[in-house]
């Protein structure tokens, strides 16, 4: 199953960010955790992310948008170890 199929099958809501000039989507906290689990189980690293906020029924970019987190693969790190570490860092960032 692809990530797109996983998102569709699990009825995960995507919030387009085109109005901010960003060619991507956002996910709520609960769905982001599900996606991280899928990535870990399917050996897909998570390269990083940014935090957005929902206020007055709108997605709001924080003043320091773009100052999120990222996870680069270390030299000699196996793909499996990198995936585990990147998914763990993503969970930690989202749960903060």
Model-derived features with residue positions:
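Long, contiguous N-terminal structural blocks used for assembly/anchoring
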Residues: 1-31, 38
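Short alpha-helical segments and helix-capping/turn motifs at coil-helix boundaries
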Residues: 30-34, 91-96
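Generic amphipathic, hydrophobic interface segment in small proteins and small subunits
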Residues: 34-45
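Acidic, low-complexity, intrinsically disordered interaction modules
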Residues: 43-95
């Amino acid at each position: 199953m692809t990530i797109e199929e996983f998102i569709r099958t699990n009825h995960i809501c995507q919030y387009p960010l085109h109005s901010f000039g960003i060619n991507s989507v956002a996910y709520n906290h609960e769905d982001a955790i599900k996606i991280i689990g899928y990535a870990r189980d399917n050996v897909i690293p998570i390269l990083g992310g940014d935090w957005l906020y929902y206020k007055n029924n709108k997605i709001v970019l924080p003043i320091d948008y773009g100052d999120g987190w990222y996870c680069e693969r270390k030299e000699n790190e196996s793909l499996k170890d990198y995936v585990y570490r990147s998914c763990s860092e993503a969970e930690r960032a989202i749960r903060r």
